[in-house]
Curated annotation (Swiss-Prot):
Residues 32-139 form the C-type lectin domain. Belongs to the snaclec family. Residues 1-23 form the signal peptide. It comes from Crotalus adamanteus. Expressed by the venom gland. The keyword Disulfide bond applies. Keywords: Disulfide bond, Hemostasis impairing toxin, Lectin, Secreted, Signal, Toxin. Pfam families: Lectin_C. Heteromultimer; disulfide-linked. This is C-type lectin 13.
Length: 142
């Protein structure tokens, strides 16, 4: 939804439409390229972060990235270094195949699912236990 702004300059009254100037995000969310972001400086497990983001907005999930410019935008609004990304179980759920092309039917990964955090200082993605606690940035498409 667009926003209208009323401005009065002396005897001139002007209405400005702000529709089309960016994503229509809730007032406490930041917008970038048609998505809404909200930074939460609250440490929680990955499962709790996923649930928490959905509670903040029904279409929201821990952040994921489509470009380095998006990372730069997010880093500009962060006040902490490590945060959950919307990616989990990277080893147990991958569709793996052996070097000869046959499907991997037997797996012996650790039982602990793996999740991913982003280190904002150098944009490195790190695999870590989903049971650890980190901050979260929630994201949804506007």
């Amino acid at each position: 939804m667009g926003r209208l702004v009323f401005v009065s300059f002396g005897g001139w009254d002007v209405f400005l439409s702000l529709s089309g100037t960016g994503a229509d995000c809730p007032s406490d969310w930041s917008s970038y390229e048609g998505h809404c972001y909200r930074v939460f400086q609250q440490e929680m497990t990955w499962e709790a972060a996923e649930k928490f983001c959905t509670q903040q907005h029904q279409k929201s999930h821990p952040v994921y990235f489509r470009s380095s410019e998006e990372v730069d935008f997010l880093v500009s609004i962060l006040k902490f270094d490590l945060f959950w990304m919307g990616w989990r179980d990277i080893w147990n759920e991958r569709r793996l195949q052996w070097s000869d092309g046959t499907k991997v039917n037997y797996k012996a990964w650790s039982a602990e699912p793996e999740c991913v955090v982003c280190r904002a200082t150098d944009n490195q993605w790190l695999s870590t236990s989903c049971s650890k606690t980190h901050n979260v940035v929630c994201k949804f498409q506007a």
